A protein has these predicted regions:
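Non-transmembrane, aqueous-exposed alpha-helical and coiled segments at domain scale
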Residues: 32-189
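A charged, well-structured terminal subsegment
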Residues: 2-27
Length: 189
């Protein structure tokens, strides 16, 4: 009797597991304008800043560099792109990632203005459909984004590429990795 019930239910379970998509998947989130980003003033200690940003789902709860207007403006000097340009609708929530938000999350992750072209290139790479960002960020399997960067930019930006490049003493590697995690977790949802 149990087997018959399971066999009867299996086609619907299989269909839901392999073809289901959220009803809003692929649609742009329009309830909040992407640019200019909302400005807020937070007073208190650095620990208060980290706690408040985490409570409001603006960070992952780990330490960040405060994205002050001055720091974001300095970061934007690393690109000629318009700050209002939407560079990616980040799955699965399809949050709008603008150039200004790339700069903001770059600051928070510890990146420098000279890293902006790399951050924008990373975004461009991860939004490629062949990467399947949505699949890798919504699976229950253990996944982690991986970037392969090559060429003169490695030495120019101080990107580690020898022994220990995945270790903690490679600040550019760590900052760029933290940046993409913040974008995925906060903008993508």
């Amino acid at each position: 009797e149990v087997r018959a019930k399971a066999e009867k239910a299996f086609p619907a379970i299989y269909e839901a597991a392999t073809h289901w998509k959220p009803k809003d998947a692929g649609k742009e989130v329009k309830d909040v304008p992407a640019y200019p980003a909302k400005r807020v003033k937070i007073t208190g200690t650095y620990a208060d800043l980290i706690r408040i940003m985490y409570q409001r789902k603006w960070s992952a709860g780990l330490p960040v560099i405060p994205p002050t207007p001055e720091a974001v403006a300095a970061m934007l000097k690393g690109t000629k792109k318009d700050p209002s340009e939407i560079v990616w609708l980040v799955p699965p929530r399809m949050g709008q990632l603008t150039v200004e938000l790339v700069a903001t999350y770059g600051v928070m992750a510890g990146c420098k203005p000279e890293h902006m072209p790399l951050l924008l290139a990373v975004v461009e790479a991860f939004k490629n459909p062949s990467v399947d960002w949505q699949g890798s960020t919504t699976t229950t399997a253990a996944t982690v984004p991986v970037m392969v960067i090559s060429g003169p930019i490695l030495d120019k930006l101080g990107i580690g590429y020898s022994s220990g490049e995945l270790g903690s003493f490679m600040p550019v590697n760590t900052s760029v990795g933290y940046f993409i995690n913040l974008v995925g977790d906060i903008i993508g949802g």
